[in-house]
Each structure stands twice: as C-alpha cells, then as structure tokens.
From Swiss-Prot:
This is Transforming growth factor beta-1 proprotein. The lineage of its organism: Eukaryota, Metazoa, Chordata, Craniata, Vertebrata. It comes from Cavia porcellus. Transforming growth factor beta-1 proprotein: Precursor of the Latency-associated peptide (LAP) and Transforming growth factor beta-1 (TGF-beta-1) chains, which constitute the regulatory and active subunit of TGF-beta-1, respectively. Keywords: Cleavage on pair of basic residues, Disulfide bond, Extracellular matrix, Glycoprotein, Growth factor, Mitogen, Secreted, Signal. It holds the Pfam family TGFb_propeptide. Residues 30-74 are annotated as: Straightjacket domain. Belongs to the TGF-beta family. Residues 1-29 form the signal peptide. Residues 75-271 are annotated as: Arm domain. The gene is TGFB1.
Length: 390
C-alpha cells in the first residue's frame, strides 16, 4: 500500500466504526454465533443425543434386540426404575458444573433389607420406640466392588398410613453394639403411603471398605425429655408380622432397601478422559416469546427419532436445547474494541460474542436390555433445564 494511503488509514477507521456501529447500540450482529434454521438445530441435537447415550453406556453401537424376552419388564426391574425416576423427579437441577466422574452413566442397584426372619433380629431386644433394618454387605460389595465407585446411596422405605405427627431419627450400627445418630425427619399425618429417603452415602462407603457381614440402621421415634410416651407410631411396609400366600411376596418386595448409584468398573478407567460441564429456565422460556438466549423445547421419541427399540423405559423424553442471540452493549468510549481485536487475533475461529449454552442439566433414568438381561442406568446431563450466555 502506498505511504499516502497509510497516512489516511487512521482518519478513516473512526468513520468506518461509526457507520458499522453507533455508540450504545447492541453488537449482537457482530457475533459469529451463526443464526441456524430451527429444524437443522433439532436434527443436530437429536444426532448428538444418539452419540451421547451410546458414549455414556460405553456402547459402540445399539444392542441387538434378537434375544430380548417378550412381555412386560420384570417387577423387580420396574420397581428399581420407578424408584430411580421418582428420586430424580424430586431433585432440582444444580447450576454448578458436575464433577468429571459424573459424566458417565451410573449403574443403579437395589439391595433389599435382610428378611425379618434372619437371626440377627432375634439377637436385638424388641422395643416400642425403634425398628431395625440390616443389610448383607456381601450383596453391597457385589453391586459396588470399590467404595470409590459409589456415587450415592439412599435408604428408602415406604411409610404407611400415619394418624399423628411424629419426629423420627435414623441411627447407624456402630462399634460395641452402640448406635450413631445420622439424621431426622418430621413426618406429618397422611392417609396415603409415602416413600421416605435418607442419604447414607458415607455410611455405605464405610461398609464397603471395612464392614462386617451384616450392618444395619435403627429407625426410632425422637426421644423427648418432656414426653413419657416415645412409641414409634410409624408403620413401615415390609417390616412386621409375616403374611401368607401372595401377600407374603408383595410384603417382601416392598421392604426397605438401599438404592445404590455407582460407576461400573469397566467405565472407571475412562473417567479421566472426558469432561462434561453443566439462568434462563424452562419456567420462563416455555411461557414467553423470548427471542434471545433461552431453553427451547425438544421431545425425543426413541423409536421415531432414533429408530431404537432397545430402550424400554421411558419411551422418550424432553431433551430441550439452548438457542438465541446473546446481545451486549458495545460503546466507542470503552476499551472493549481493543480487547476484542486482541482476542480475535489469538482466537480467529472463536465467537466474537457470548453464545447461548446450557447451564443446568438433569439426569435421565432408562431401562434397556443387554442380551436377555434388563438393566437400569441413570444417564447424567441429558435434560436441559436452563441456559446462559457464555
């Protein structure tokens, strides 16, 4: 370029900037986050989910359906799936990023309480203020071979009809037949059964590391200093007098259990190689006509959209996705233009403006078959609940 033109360049640049962008005007038009056709976005999201599910399950391709037994799912599998689904539904999405190990699917296992007929219960004095629940640690270790693989453990029990309000406490069996306090709940009167849940992740990790053959919990009425009657008024399904016939089987299936979520051994070695990070939420975005960054609805039918028949529950789910511009104010009286120029110099392929990305995500429990065996797993970060500009 001739020297005379070089001398004019500093004078022309301010005029060019004024033509392109007036002071205080949103600079969203300069974003390299391209506007994409909605249908194209949905198709790309569906294909991404196809790969995401297979990746989380460590499957190179969808399982064969040739050996799947006909008929409905086994009752035990369906009960485990329902328990997992109910737990997820009861939790709100966390806005913080999940730790690296939470990227891969967790294998969900239900370990039932040792039956009431076991001798361990006969060795404990029967009292009106407490009931006891013991578990076989060999069953726990079979489900989770390494304590470090355990992501979460919950003690779940079904409370039957309750006529009076009662404060209850949970204790862990400790050394020398003593009991260590864990947590408490205030139960209100109800005519319908209700599932109670206690987080016992730390306790189960201890049992997996150095527990005895049988370990247990004590579920007690709160011992109030000013009350003479500390009787436990709560009746727990599966604990109590033996039933006969079909009722005995139902009674046994409904007894308290531990719900374990753990990373399978075959996936543990891959934890270091992948990361997945997780506002504008569904309550706002689904009820407004917001054009900027927001959660957009997307329902995926496993059979229709992915051509999959190997996932038995659920039939589909609301995956959702984030879409919309992220405008910002760019004034000529700021230093932002200098920063942006330097940023683009070092990151020529990056966006010049913030992009709309997921902020909070929730897991998806599924039931699928591997050969003739039905499995329940929880896939993390599958449902977009809120978005942000980043």
């Amino acid at each position: 370029m001739p020297p005379s033109r070089l001398r004019l360049l500093p004078l022309l640049l301010p005029l060019l900037w004024l033509l392109v962008l007036a002071p205080g005007r949103p600079a969203s038009g300069l974003s390299t986050c391209k506007t994409i056709d909605m249908e194209l976005v949905k198709r790309k999201r569906i294909e991404a989910i196809r790969g995401q599910i297979l990746s989380k399950l460590r499957l190179a391709s969808p399982p064969s359906q040739g050996d799947v037994p006909p008929g409905p799912l086994p009752e035990a599998v369906l009960a485990l799936y329902n328990s997992t689904r109910d737990r997820v539904a009861g939790e709100s999405a966390e806005p913080e990023p999940e730790p690296e190990p939470d990227y891969y699917a967790k294998e969900v296992t239900r370990v039932l309480m040792v039956d009431n007929s076991h001798n361990i219960y006969k060795s404990i004095e029967t009292v009106a203020h407490s009931i006891y629940m013991f578990f076989n640690t060999s069953e726990l270790r079979e489900a989770v071979p390494d304590p470090l693989l355990l992501s979460r453990a919950e003690l779940r029990m079904q409370r039957l009809k309750l006529n009076v309000e009662q404060h209850v406490e949970l204790y862990q069996k400790y050394s020398n037949n003593s009991w260590r306090y864990l947590s408490n709940q205030l139960l209100t009167p109800s005519d319908t059964p209700e599932w109670l849940s206690f987080d016992v992740t730390g306790v189960v990790r201890q049992w997996l590391s150095q527990g005895e053959e049988l370990e247990g919990f004590r579920f007690s009425a709160h011992c109030s200093c000013d009350s003479k009657d500390n009787t436990l008024r709560v009746e727990i399904n599966g604990i109590g007098p033996k039933r006969r016939g079909d009722l005995a089987a139902i009674h046994g299936m409904n007894r308290p259990f531990l719900l374990l979520m753990a990373t399978p051994l075959e996936r543990a070695q891959h934890l270091h190689s992948s990361r997945h990070r997780r506002g504008l939420d569904t309550n706002y975005c689904f009820s407004s006509t917001e054009k900027n960054c927001c959660v957009r609805q997307l329902y995926i039918d496993f059979r229709k959209d992915l051509g999959w028949k190997w996932i038995h529950e659920p039939k589909g789910y609301h995956a959702n996705f984030c879409l919309g511009p992220c405008p910002y104010i760019w004034s000529l009286d700021t230093q932002y233009s200098k920063v942006l120029a330097l940023y683009n110099q070092h990151n020529p392929g990056a966006s010049a403006a913030p992009c709309c990305v997921p902020q909070a995500l929730e897991p998806l429990p599924i039931v699928y078959y591997v050969g003739r065996k039905a499995k329940v797993e929880q896939l993390s970060n599958m449902i977009v609940r809120s978005c942000k500009c980043s």
